[in-house]
Curated annotation (Swiss-Prot):
Family: Belongs to the LDH/MDH superfamily. MDH type 2 family.
List of residues binding substrate: R94, R100, N133, R164
Gene of this entry: mdh
Organism: Deinococcus radiodurans (strain ATCC 13939 / DSM 20539 / JCM 16871 / CCUG 27074 / LMG 4051 / NBRC 15346 / NCIMB 9279 / VKM B-1422 / R1)
Role, per record: Catalyzes the reversible oxidation of malate to oxaloacetate.
NCBIfam families listed in its UniProt record: MalateDH-SF1, PRK05442.1
GO molecular function, one term: L-malate dehydrogenase (NAD+) activity
Protein name: Malate dehydrogenase
Length: 330
């Protein structure tokens, strides 16, 4: 196998829990393939640089054939320089008693300068994935502060919800995850998201013919939407390894394409498809070819789906209005 030229992969919050699960898999080739060397460009806040150096020691000790180099910095202008891929993981977590507006404001202080730095120094074709929550609106903030980059460079992660939707359906039906196709997560990475099985198949047969409608509406949808809270409750910490795995899946499919006849869910800028307000970063069903994603068009939308899709869009509009008031987006 001939090796390609190394690509530059920037990761923020690199010394955190998700970063720790993510970096070794990128270095092992899980994200971009076994023939693609990578240069990791890791960003952390100044107090975490010492811990980050420990992670770098471990990365070097992994002796990964695909790991061409590792760069660390507390300056986004250094970490994002010529980046081909950027995974924005570092964010301000919600603390007890914090209102959504406070959280959006605190994250604006992170994602506005990061958007500006990406716009200034990243590759013009950079693929940006925002993992740090609230991911959709953080992605919007970064995107709006990088006007020189194509808006489609910016995406938000709903793949964790998508993977949760697959695994819950597999558990219920006794099928393997690989036998399930075309689940969709519409909207926000929040409890208003809509895990949609109307187009999904299990072993080639419609999913909704194999499960009870009451279970779907009253158990399945809330279980998928609130899974993150259930993990915090059980583990005493938020989902990190599964989030890292979903980030790998999202970037892998964006870089290398989706399988024929299948789609995945990505948070992307709405072009008005399915009546979703243009410009919102919203979870859609997408197919990817040659590194470009396209929304799957022409899917039937029932009244039930319409209500769910509009409710999560409304939440995203409210978040956008809040960050607009704070002067973080246009």
């Amino acid at each position: 196998m001939t090796m390609k030229q190394p690509v530059r992969v920037a990761v923020t919050g690199a010394a955190g829990q998700i970063g720790y699960s993510l970096l070794f898999r990128i270095a092992a080739g899980d994200m971009l393939g076994q023939d693609q060397p990578v240069i990791l460009q890791l960003l952390e806040i100044t107090p975490a640089l010492k811990a980050l150096n420990g992670v770098v020691m471990e990365l070097r000790d992994g002796a990964f054939p695909l790991l061409a180099d590792v760069i660390t910095s507390d300056d986004p202008m250094v970490a994002f320089k010529d980046a081909d891929y950027a995974l924005l993981v570092g964010a301000m977590p919600r603390k007890a008693g914090m209102e959504r507006g406070d959280l959006l404001g605190a994250n604006g202080g992170i994602f506005k300068p990061q958007g500006e730095a990406l716009g200034a120094v990243a590759s013009r074709n950079v693929k940006v994935l925002v993992v740090g929550n609230p991911a959709n609106t953080n992605a919007l903030i970064a995107q709006q502060n990088a006007p020189d980059l194509d808006p489609k460079c910016f995406t938000a992660m709903v793949r964790l919800d998508h993977n949760r939707a697959l695994s819950q359906l597999a558990e219920k039906t006794g099928a393997a995850v690989s036998d399930i196709k075309n689940v969709t997560i519409w909207g926000n990475h929040s409890s208003t998201q809509y895990p949609d099985l109307s187009q999904a198949t299990v072993n080639g047969k419609p999913a909704l013919e194999q499960v009870d409608r009451t279970w779907y509406e009253n158990d399945y949808i809330p279980t998928v939407a609130k899974r993150g809270a259930a993990i915090i409750e059980a583990r005493g910490a938020s989902s990190a390894a599964s989030a890292a795995s979903a980030a790998i899946d999202h970037m892998h499919d964006w870089a290398l394409g989706t399988k024929d006849g299948e789609w995945v869910s990505m948070g992307i800028p709405s072009d008005g498809s399915y009546g979703i307000p243009e410009g919102l970063i919203y979870g859609f069903p997408v197919r990817v070819k040659d590194g470009k994603y396209e929304i799957v068009q022409g899917l039937d939308v029932s009244d039930f789906s319409r209500g769910k899709m509009d409710a999560t869009a409304q939440e995203l509009e409210e978040e956008r209005d809040e960050v607009r008031k704070l002067g973080l987006v246009k």
